[in-house]
Amino acid sequence: MLFGKIKALVEYGVRTGLIEAEDTIYTRNRLLEALCEEDYADEEAERSENLALLLDGLCDEAVKRGIIEDGATSRDLFDTKLMGLLTPRPSDVNRTFRALYKESPEKATDWFYKLCGDCNYIRRDRVARDLKWVYNDPRFGAIDITINLSKPEKDPKAIAAAKKIKASGYPACMLCKENIGYAGRMNHPARQNHRAIPITVNHADWFLQYSPYVYYNEHCIVFCGEHVPMQIDKSTFRKLFDFVEQFPHYFLGSNADLSIVGGSILTHDHYQGGHYTFAMARANMEEHCTLHGFEDVEAGILNWPVSVLRLRHKNPERLIDAADHVLKAWRSYTDEDAFIFAETDGEPHNTITPIARCVDGVYELDLALRNNITTEKYPLGVYHPHDEYHHIKKENIGLIEVMGLAVLPSRLKDELKTLKDVMLKNGDVSSVESIAKHAEWAAQVKRDHPEMNEANAEHILQQEVGKVFVKVLENAGVYKCTAEGRKAFRTFVESVR
């Protein structure tokens, strides 16, 4: 049984190109060592086209042999260790990537993306669990909605074990290059199968990797070789375009550098990109405007719920200079009538979420204006999801959401199913603890959709979730999509000198 599983995994490695045929005996022996087995007999390889099932079987063997505890985190640590034995060394990966890059950047990234899935760094079986649908908004177009189920939730054993582990500062964070090949521990994921491509960005050492959770096609992360904090300045725009010029089929964007409106990791400078067209990228300029001193740069306010200024030019240097002017102006801009305050009590509030891309030979830079001011009424942020939408989304609106992809919490999968069942029975939503938070919203959905039945209920709820997400994006917009909001937006643009 064990030998058949090991043989199947080795054959998988050869079939996918992770290892060469002549590596068969060597790899088999490494796997035997990992499973504390000194013997081997040639058995028929277990038939399994499903890598996850094969690895589950090997984890079962490890549990039986007392090598690991039977918990989700222990199993993840162990199966990553096994896949690390099949994953090519970083130098081999880099060499192949560079050779393919000479043929075309797209060929290189296609190969690397496949490698990251084949070696199980991207756990395809888990990514496939994510729920995805499209909400067609009448104003803003096709909005992507996802309920994220691929991020593993800590099991109780792992939580208990993590409390006993001595605090470690290595690697300094989840993004650091020191994660490449790292064995992991109960409170830090294993990364033996993790690879990142060294690249030069703005004359500095950076790395290209893929997100293990792939929220969209070829979801990549570009991170600094040094553990330095996020910062939005002129060099940010230069780095974004430096990357896009090297990989013109990818967009690249940065989270904002302030809390509330920033991403989950502000301590390590990094960007996110990929081979995907978001709703925001498809959005048209609602009105064109002129930036003083940059009359040759096409500029306009985007038809989008978040307040976005789009800049276009064939020369990225012009966009870098123009964006720097906009950023400096926005950092110090106050408009009390529009409730825009550059700072309060010495705390800065204004920043930008920038996204760079190349479209048919023309470079684009979208500048989403952000502000993280809080008030007594909105302690989590005025331009943050408001309380009435927290039953769907209360987390920060980061780069991915700004572009039009909702990453919603996993709890919604079960909550929406329960909600559908209760609503179809005309039950009392407020009396069911797990979905009571949705009661007011559910009542409104019922009023808006008297036609709701078993056949259409799921679709209706999905579309209504999409509507809520657009409302959340509107909350994040510092200038609302109203005549008054657009007037205030124009006032800012005209102030840029």
Predicted stretch roles:
Residues 193-195, 225-252:
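Helical scaffold of the NTase/Pol beta-like nucleotidyltransferase catalytic core
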